Amino acid sequence: MTSPLNLTPTDWLARLSRQHDVELPRLKALNDEYELRSARSYMHPEIFREIGDRLQQVVIAWAQLVVDSVEERLDPEGFRLPDQDSGDDDLWRVWQENDADENSQLGRIDALVMRRSFVCVGTNEADADTPLITFESPLEMYADIDPRNRQVRAALRRWVDPQASPSLPSAPQMITGGGGVKYATLYLPNSTHWFENGIEQDRDEHMVGTVMVAPLVNRSRLTDWLGRSELETVLPLVHAANKIATDMMVAAEFVALPIRGLMGLSPSDFEDSAGNKLTAIQAMLGRFVAIPDDDGTGKTFEFSSANLDNFHQTINQLARLVASIAGLPPHYLGLTTENPPSADSIRSAEMRLVKRAERKQVPFGGAYEQTMRLVKRLQDGDWDPRYRRLETIWRDPSTPTIVQKADAAVKLYNLPKPIVPLRQTREDLGYTDAQIARMQTEDTKAAAEDPLTQIANQLSARPGSLSGAAA
């Protein structure tokens, strides 16, 4: 039970809207960093005045790399109770019918980038046995956490339909800025309310006693249950790398080509053999004719082109710092050596990344388990105490691909003394109970058709065969 506040739904709407508005600027900034829309950093104003719109910042996608490298190793494969040999097929059915296989990936990315995301559960009028599961962005949703038990006390989702025309007076406390109709969904322990332009339009009195929202929080702390972004620690280095890469392109524009000068000549003297004036780019590339002055003493000189190695070395050093902070293998950031790495060295380099993924499975799995407990509550009409121990089944993050997973499972089974039986191997490969049952039927059929098995069966069925052989 959460600590109740004596607030009306309208009061909750205003309270959560204000709290959400405070965080929105930072959440949008983090989202822009992931989408490679970051602002220019460490750039001198004189460069902007000199180059103007010709300067396009070079953006290195390290922010996406840091997030995606972890998320690619987070794959839920089912839910089960500790005393069950296999996963709960019905919960997995609800998960898949809500397209949670695809949408949960989006929720994990948002949580890693913007500190948290949310999973919402609701009643399904079309099919009461399949409650609705949706994944929501922190840009649209906010939850109030009870400081006593750290459970969700209320949650609010706000969004705007820019294509619709407002038919009711607007409510500035809901969403600031933008045109169109402003909608909101308010989640309370015993009811869900829908608002349009600040006026309640409908409600669902589900009487569950718990807010039907499970926060997916990344890197929460004891005093900060709203989480932190995976990008917080690497953004200064990413900005520095973007600045160095941009400086390198500016240097390539102005000083990467040799600069040639001529003494005793004016710009009008640059002509080709036909008497045509040379363009600036032709002169810069050296395709010009040197014309001496009246006394024939025209002289040419040349400045050597700039060496860009210092930019390369700086970017490589920043890449090493990002790899060490984010726990990424060096080859993820393009850092290689002359000697190709061995398979063992690659696995060793990925150990910290694997451990980071395993750490993420604990809080993210807890949110998914709470989601499925809410699903079970809507299905049965009451709480099942057994589901307090529900577990999320995750794919092994050290074998993120199907090929790696199959190789590991088959090796465990093909040992001289197998560590796991055949059924467990098939479960590790991700086959469902129905698929495993069909495989076992085919195994039995194949064994019955085996010639040696048929001969053995005939001998064992022949009357007195053993006694005759003994005689």
For the regions a language model picked out, list residue spans one by one.
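Extended, charged amphipathic alpha-helical segments
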Residues: 5, 201-348, 390, 401
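Charge-rich, acidic-biased intrinsically disordered regions
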Residues: 16-17, 24, 124, 128-129, ...
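Extended, regular secondary-structure scaffolds
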Residues: 118-230
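Short, amphipathic alpha-helical "recognition" segments used to contact nucleic acids or chromatin
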Residues: 406-416
